[in-house]
Amino acid sequence: MNLNFMISKDVLQGPWAGLPVAWKKDLSFDEEAYRSDVARTCAAGVPGVYTAGTTGEFYAMEFDEWKTIARVTVDECRCAGTPVMIGVTSTYALGAARRAAFAAELGADAIQVALPYWMDIDDRMIIPFFQEVTEACPGMALSIYETRRTKKTLTLEQHRAVFDCTGSYLAVKSNEGTLGCSPKGCEQLSEFVNVWVGEDNWNALGPYGAIGSASALVYMNPRVILKMFDLLSRKQWNELQPLTDQVKRLIEQGLRPFAARGFTDTGFDRLMGKASRFLTMNVNSRGTYPSATDEDVFALQKWMQENTPELLLL
């Protein structure tokens, strides 16, 4: 594997912006609005941008749409000089490998991939899967999207085996219920890969090595979230705590009415980005899952003005 041009582990740190896709009213791709929001996010100074995660609705687009959106994302990030990662998750290994090869062709810096999620993955399939995907994009950094939605969470030994066999595994997005979201697991993983957790966990897991996030909050308020990462980097835990508390309050209280209505990742994340007026794209997301509305944006704005006003100050 040729790793001569692979980005360093240090690049995959901080709040990488996992942007939603801009859709028109008819739910076709709104390239103009999307380019504008990617460019604005890059200009805000984020350490990196990625697309085709859950917020980016990789599961709700055709392969040709995915290719167009990936190309546009890389194009805008290259113009801005911002590192870029493309999500390549698929229901089958060849699908992920084809996406990884296309991301390499575009010149992306990294790929993010979860295990295939339709049928259960046997432990014996894990290493061959990551080998097949990374062999399709030699020289590109790998970030694992670890989530219980795939019906399989990795052990420390499996993470280490992926690290050893690929030579490109640099970061893991650790979600609730996975190894990196516990203090001990975060500390163990941080010995060889960067661990990303939600900003609401930075104060709890930063002391154990957490060093970034797959962030929806950074395009809600880049000023606050980049300040939080600076405090995390300098291990200023007392100063970080009040900001972490605001983020937790927003997630646990401000978003509660929308969770009760069945919102999922992209619904929440569009809503927050629109509430602060940082994102310009339409708030609509594709079904089957509930989509936020303009009325929802106004409702969250009102709640934030009363409860977390600093998060609205761009």
Question: Which stretches of residues belong to each language-model region?
Answer:
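Alpha-helix N-cap/helix-start motif at coil-to-helix transitions, marked by capping-box chemistry
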Residues: 10-13, 215, 219, 263
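A general structural signal for well-ordered alpha-helical segments in protein cores
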Residues: 34, 66, 70, 96, ...
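Catalytic alpha/beta core domains of metabolic enzymes, predominantly
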Residues: 132, 136-138, 147-258
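Active-site beta->alpha loop and helix N-cap motifs at the rims of alpha/beta catalytic domains
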Residues: 2-151, 288-289
